[in-house]
């Protein structure tokens, strides 16, 4: 007889259902199940699936449904074709981005990201291309091929309209920006000029003397500033007379500013001038770099003044009241014999030749070396008449033009 064990109701196996949360993964056909949907299956205690108790539940019902990357890009204004971007994949819901230096910068939200992408899209449509950030490239040695490529790139950038625009903008920005070193250099010069203004009541002679005095003061001030910056001796000079001439002209301190034939008001025969650039400030000789100064008389060029300087390899000679003057040009002072060329009857040489026919006087300034060999003194020797000219071979074998001038009745100057 078989004994039947009685089972109490408390020990009876009950059918208990529970929800198993499966991890999220890609599903072949995910159109039926959303990205945040979780398939739940009810099982009994025997481990058998209960097909009658299968349903869909939300794992996190309070979270908003994430959008695909394609939909976000479409909202931003991009033309995204189906299947070309994103491939149906969803961006991760969380990204662990380390914040620099543990700052308080918060990551962008979805709405802020959409606005940012829309703004960048708008800028691309306006300017035609995306913004390119500049990178600092360290200098390194280039191979010949890379050097040619870099030179070609530099030429394209140099001639591009954007480069010209940037240079123009930079020049406009720096146009009114004062430079400190120029202000420091001219602070003393301007004070000298302000204290020594020319008066309208002065005679022509007084104006010439006053301008020459101011020229010397400004020259000395520039010479001291240059020696202080260089840390050297004050006796070293490098074309400071040209700088002084430029400053006085800019400040309107020039007298006898118009070219003329004959004598100049305020200047007497025998006047000594320390600098060649000062001859232009007082209107005696305007050609700072040239030895012959000329102007137009009608349709012809005639000479107004010449500067004869000894030691310039031109062979100028003075015999009593006669002067033999060598024409200009031909690179006579060049050490390269191949650079020496024949002089031509143009410019100042032609003006001296025309003065013979026009019978116009020429002012002659003689440059004499100082006793200390520190520069030259320029002495006004008076008016001369050009009598004739001719060609001859110079010491280097090139053709030179020689002019004979004779001094008219004027006070004698002792040299």
UniProtKB/Swiss-Prot annotation:
<dbReference type="Pfam" id="PF02182">
    <property type="entry name" value="SAD_SRA"/>
</dbReference>
<dbReference type="InterPro" id="IPR036987">
    <property type="entry name" value="SRA-YDG_sf"/>
</dbReference>
<dbReference type="InterPro" id="IPR003105">
    <property type="entry name" value="SRA_YDG"/>
</dbReference>
<keyword id="KW-0539">Nucleus</keyword>
<feature type="region of interest" description="Disordered">
    <location>
        <begin position="163"/>
        <end position="186"/>
    </location>
</feature>
<dbReference type="InterPro" id="IPR015947">
    <property type="entry name" value="PUA-like_sf"/>
</dbReference>
<feature type="domain" description="YDG">
    <location>
        <begin position="262"/>
        <end position="407"/>
    </location>
</feature>
<protein>
    <recommendedName>
        <fullName>YDG domain-containing protein At5g47160</fullName>
    </recommendedName>
</protein>
<dbReference type="InterPro" id="IPR051357">
    <property type="entry name" value="H3K9_HMTase_SUVAR3-9"/>
</dbReference>
<dbReference type="GO" id="GO:0005634">
    <property type="term" value="C:nucleus"/>
</dbReference>
